[in-house]
Amino acid sequence: MLGLFKRAPKLEAVFRPTVAVARELTREVEVAGELVLRNLGRAAELTDLELVLIGGGTRRIDLVVPEAWRGRLRLGAGGELTAAVAWKLTLAAPMRAPAAEIQVNTTAGGRHQPLATTPAFPLANE
């Protein structure tokens, strides 16, 4: 009964890209940098995280979650998780987008629930 009234944690996601390129002709996307997830509320327990790259506001591409972020994570009030990430993905269709953002979701409880989204960062097109 108490689980019905459980609030989603107040999280903030920040991505500092070192590489962010969409290669339209080869159907590739390469994104690398530092991803930070901050807890702005009280202590929270995070499980079943997933990351999604949103290109141009509509294109959604699943990303591999950093190894340290898998499983059950305890994030104290004011705490943060930091990971150096690098993804190079081959797409089924070409993508041209001026900007992208990374969305952090959870699938705990059988539903996709967005937890935080990074501010948009420029995505170079080659």
Residues covered by each model-derived region:
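Short glycine/proline/serine/threonine-rich loop/turn segments at secondary-structure transition edges
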Residues: L91-E101
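Short, solvent-exposed loop/turn segments enriched in Ser/Thr/Gly
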Residues: R27-E34, T82-A84, A99-E101
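A beta-strand/beta-hairpin structural motif
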Residues: L63-L91
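Short beta-strand elements
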Residues: R111-E126
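Short acidic, flexible loop segments centered on an aromatic residue
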Residues: L40-R60
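Low-complexity, acidic Ser/Thr/Pro/Gly-rich terminal tails and inter-domain linkers that flank the onset
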Residues: L2-T26
